[in-house]
């Protein structure tokens, strides 16, 4: 569980921003959204495989030399 200690004379907005930052760093919101609905194991594997292919394609495109523009 994440706890944030509010310092003396600290505005609420600053404390809320610190809380949101720690939640984001821990990845709790992404995990919560992923577990919101049941996903069949085959659908999960298919989604992860597609993401890996997309990442690989993006990495290859970044390594290629740009085409000459003339």
Swiss-Prot record:
Any one GO cellular component localisation term in the record: ribonucleoprotein complex
Domain of life: Bacteria
Pfam family for this entry, one: Ribosomal_S21
Entry GO MF terms: structural constituent of ribosome
InterPro entries, sorted: Ribosomal_bS21 (IPR001911), Ribosomal_bS21_CS (IPR018278), Ribosomal_bS21_sf (IPR038380)
Gene Ontology BP, a term: translation
Keywords from the named record: Ribonucleoprotein, Ribosomal protein
Record family assignment: Belongs to the bacterial ribosomal protein bS21 family.
Name under which the protein is recorded: Small ribosomal subunit protein bS21
Gene name tied to this protein: rpsU
